[in-house]
Amino acid sequence: MELLLLSNSTLPGKAWLEHALPLIAEQLQGRRSAVFIPFAGVTQTWDDYTAKTAAVLAPLGVSVTGIHSVVDPVAAIENAEIVIVGGGNTFQLLKQCRERGLLAPITDVVKRGALYIGWSAGANLACPTIRTTNDMPIVDPQGFDALNLFPLQINPHFTNALPEGHKGETREQRIRELLVVAPELTIIGLPEGNWITVSKGHATLGGPNTTYVFKAGEEAVPLEVGHRF
């Protein structure tokens, strides 16, 4: 399988997806036809989200079709060379994909060789479940099971920082709560600016910041760039 799982879409001082474009270009390998899954977008229309994505990827020679705009979305996915899943609200994303019967077709086409690109919520959707999202559950997705393209759980936008005076939980504390009730999980705290690529049977960590892996009953382990999962 070929996957590009990004923690986020924007870095300080850079345009939207600018940091991801070289990574995308490297994994295209001749692929040019993409379907875009915009369903995580809540405060922007799906048409606008699709147009924004298409404009960014046009210089790479990638044509983008919004999955919400086609008559037969399952067929569009089955014929896609690239599946792109944008960030936003993960619960809304999973709900729409489940209701439209898109989860199995996405899994199948990626396993057959299509490239999967997802950022934030799109990275969460590639995991076994969406239980490590940071998002508010604004809708009920009728279960948390997701695509299971990547075998570990990703927590995107990972940071353990707390504003001064804030009394809520740190991100690690929230991850530890999940590991109490689901100790079988391995959770990757993927900070902004980092990504995981899956190519030719290898999953590799990239990016400038320290990523952490969390397991039940163990201290968090820092992972360096180039780590293979």
From Swiss-Prot:
SUPFAM superfamilies: Class I glutamine amidotransferase-like. Its main location: cytoplasm. Its EC number is 3.4.13.21. It catalyses: Dipeptidase E catalyzes the hydrolysis of dipeptides Asp-|-Xaa. It does not act on peptides with N-terminal Glu, Asn or Gln, nor does it cleave isoaspartyl peptides. It is found in: Cytoplasm. GO terms for molecular function: dipeptidase activity; serine-type peptidase activity. PANTHER family: ALPHA-ASPARTYL DIPEPTIDASE (PTHR20842:SF0), PROTEASE S51 ALPHA-ASPARTYL DIPEPTIDASE (PTHR20842). This is Peptidase E. It comes from Escherichia coli O81 (strain ED1a).
